[in-house]
Amino acid sequence: MGIIVSSFIGCGREFFKNVYGDKIKIFDAVDEIPLTDIDGKINSDLLDGYVNETLNATNNSDIVFIDFSNTVRNAFNERNIDYDLFYPSKERKNEFIENQVIKRTKPKDIQTLDRNFEKWVDEIDDDKTDNCYKHKLANKGEFIGNTPLIMQYIDSLKQ
């Protein structure tokens, strides 16, 4: 059974899939399961299906990535579903903004990240949910794909 991972914007989900996609089974619910309306807002009618399909995907995958939004995380929390959450320290805001500019993210998305970065990190820090295992990426250049926790997990799959 695989683990469920939620990652803050810019924590390296796409990079991780590119590097490890041929070594382990990765399912990306963010890309694979419909969750939003045409206008980009989360559709509450799709949320139950999203959670159920994500849980089913853990049976055939080593890692399942889920959406970072509070709505999705709250749905997992309400159902007491364990997941790992990777997020940066507030001190890394400029690094994350710069990386999004380099990646050529849409300007409005960069503005949203810039405007909400500290608030989102504070919300995660304040979250006391028992089934959310938080991993703060405090060091410059530290992302999902190079954290010891994930590396140990990947190594354990090979055994």
Language-model-detected regions and their locations in the chain:
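Glycine-rich phosphate-binding P-loop
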Residues: M1-G21
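A glycine- and Lys/Arg-enriched "phosphate-lid" helix/loop adjacent to the NTP-binding pocket
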Residues: R79-T129
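NTP-dependent small-molecule kinase module
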Residues: E123-Q159
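Structural motif
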Residues: S6-I9, I66-N70, P88, L137-G141
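Alpha-helix boundary/N-cap detector
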Residues: I42-D45, K108, T112, G145-P148
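Conserved nucleotide-sensing/catalytic segment adjacent to the nucleotide-binding pocket
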Residues: D22-D84
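Short, well-ordered alpha-helical microsegments
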Residues: G12-E14, N70-A75, K93
